[in-house]
C-alpha cells in the first residue's frame, strides 16, 4: 500500500506541537481592519491552539502521519 499524502494546504496553515496539539494562526486579520479597535487588532497577532475536536479532525483526515 502506498504512503498517504499530506494535504498541502493544511501543511501550510497548521503546525503540530511536541505534545500533539494543533497550532494555527488567528483568523480574521486579512481585511476590514478599519472597523476594529487597536486592541482587537493586537489580540489577533500570533497563534492559537485549536480545540481538541478540531485538532483531532485535522490530524486524522489531513495530516495522516501526525500523532493520533
UniProtKB/Swiss-Prot annotation:
Gene3D superfamilies: 4.10.410.60. GO terms for molecular function: structural constituent of ribosome. Coiled coil: none annotated. GO terms for biological process: translation. InterPro entries: Ribosomal_bL35, Ribosomal_bL35-like, Ribosomal_bL35_CS, Ribosomal_bL35_sf. One of its GO terms (cellular component) is cytosolic large ribosomal subunit. Keywords: Ribonucleoprotein, Ribosomal protein. The keyword Ribosomal protein applies. Pfam families: Ribosomal_L35p (PF01632). It comes from the Bacteria. Belongs to the bacterial ribosomal protein bL35 family. This is Large ribosomal subunit protein bL35.
